[in-house]
Amino acid sequence: MTGRGKGGKGLGKGGAKRHRKVLRDNIQGITKPAIRRLARRGGVKRISSLIYEETRGVLKVFLENVIRDAVTYTEHAKIPTVTAMDVVYALKRQGRTLYGFGG
């Protein structure tokens, strides 16, 4: 055993994957009912059919900006994993302070 504790197999310690799944159309995973639930939480009663695609586009841009900033913090710290604090700092930098995740 090479110092891996009781796990034995050493899962997650392998090399690069041979076949990486191509990521496309994942934005469609934000379903119509999910957008409807978010709108309901915001106090919306009736929703136009054009809203769903528009919401997906806005959400995609927002997440791209937050993730870009969070990854920048992670790379600066020279660590391989994006932490919750990286995301908190990225949101704070964009003027959207988030409480409850440390710091």
Swiss-Prot record:
Gly residues composition bias: residue spans: 1-14
UniProt cross-references to InterPro entries, sorted A to Z: Histone-fold, Histone_H4, Histone_H4_CS
Subcellular location: Nucleus; Chromosome
SUPFAM superfamilies with a match to the protein in the record: Histone-fold (SSF47113)
Residue range(s) of DNA binding per entry: 17-21
GO cellular component: nucleosome; nucleus
Recorded superkingdom: Eukaryota
Modified residues (N6-acetyl-N6-methyllysine): K6, K13
Region (Disordered): 1-20
Swiss-Prot/TrEMBL keywords: Acetylation, Chromosome, DNA-binding, Methylation, Nucleosome core, Nucleus
GO MF: DNA binding; protein heterodimerization activity; structural constituent of chromatin
Family designation: Belongs to the histone H4 family.
Entry function: Core component of nucleosome. Nucleosomes wrap and compact DNA into chromatin, limiting DNA accessibility to the cellular machineries which require DNA as a template. Histones thereby play a central role in transcription regulation, DNA repair, DNA replication and chromosomal stability. DNA accessibility is regulated via a complex set of post-translational modifications of histones, also called histone code, and nucleosome remodeling.
Subunit annotation: The nucleosome is a histone octamer containing two molecules each of H2A, H2B, H3 and H4 assembled in one H3-H4 heterotetramer and two H2A-H2B heterodimers. The octamer wraps approximately 147 bp of DNA.
Protein name: Histone H4
Organism in which the protein naturally occurs: Trichogramma cacaeciae
Lineage, broadest ranks: Eukaryota, Metazoa, Ecdysozoa, Arthropoda, Hexapoda
